[in-house]
Amino acid sequence: MSWYIHRFKPFIDHNFRTLPDREHTFIGGSSMGGLMSLYALLQYNDVFSRAAALSPSIWVSPEKLSGLVGRANLAPGTVLYMDYGSREMGNHEGMRRGFAEMCSKVLTRGIHLTSRIVPGGTHSEASWEKQLPFMFHTLMYEVEE
């Protein structure tokens, strides 16, 4: 993530017409990319104001992620869209419980969260594509503090 923050983003901001400030800098991804997007929002909240984490692999290290949520230095107006599909893994009950715990933890920090369990959703690009309208709606709406 350091390379992304210190090399890639400055390159993009220098070579393309962007609004490089935090308020206009979002990140998103699916699966491990969803986990990295959640991590980036928490660890680099001075860079990213909003993130989309589609089917984030929070099961990889839930304790470390929960700790990061608890200690992250978050600015007001931080927004997160997070979802997963009901048909993603064999242990839906465990996934649902872990997802709910992460959502609860995020909400305690004042993050504006939109979370969804997608009925019939799978761990696939075809399923994630169908979530784009929900994701963009969340990332683009005005936040009322």
Roles of regions detected by a PLM:
Residues 1-145:
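Non-catalytic cap/lid and distal C-terminal segments of serine-dependent acyl enzymes
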